[in-house]
Amino acid sequence: MPKVLIVDDDPDIVDSLKLILSAEGYAVAAATSREEGMRAVAKEKPDLIILDVMMEQPDDGLVVAQDLRHQGVKTPIIILSSIGHVTGYKFGKDSEVAPVDEFVSKPIAPKDLVAKVKKFLRK
């Protein structure tokens, strides 16, 4: 069963994403901070990571993505954030600022979330 790691400091978001993804048959782990997220990636070995951008610091999600890529982690990363594309940053595996595979704005419809997850996990 593919495992998804959610890193978001909003417990309501975490709970709703867990509910949606668990119902689709995914194993789901969660972390609520940048530090917890980094530890969870090492411990849980997820097949997909969903990150919020703004947690304790305004750029926490981007820092997690940057740190993971610098460590050689190839796991697909989806940024799920209320700031959308307003930052003007280019995202993608080759981006230094936002080395993620997908950037999705909150709120997201459950069916759209599942479609994004399936895109990367081919389930």
Question: Where in the sequence are the language-model features?
Answer:
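Active-site beta3 strand of CheY-like receiver
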Residues: 44-50
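Helix N-cap/capping motif at the beta->alpha junctions
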Residues: 30-39, 60-61
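The short loop immediately C-terminal to the conserved phospho-acceptor aspartate in CheY-like receiver
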Residues: 10, 54-56
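Conserved phosphotransfer cores of two-component systems
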Residues: 42-44, 68-74
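Hydrophobic/aromatic residues positioned on beta-strands within the core alpha/beta folds
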Residues: 80-82
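Two-component/phosphorelay signaling modules centered on CheY-like receiver
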Residues: 11-29
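Alpha4 helix (beta4-alpha4-beta5 surface) of REC/receiver domains from two-component response regulators
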Residues: 62-63, 70, 84-104, 111, ...
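Conserved sequence signature across two-component system core domains
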Residues: 7-8, 31, 49
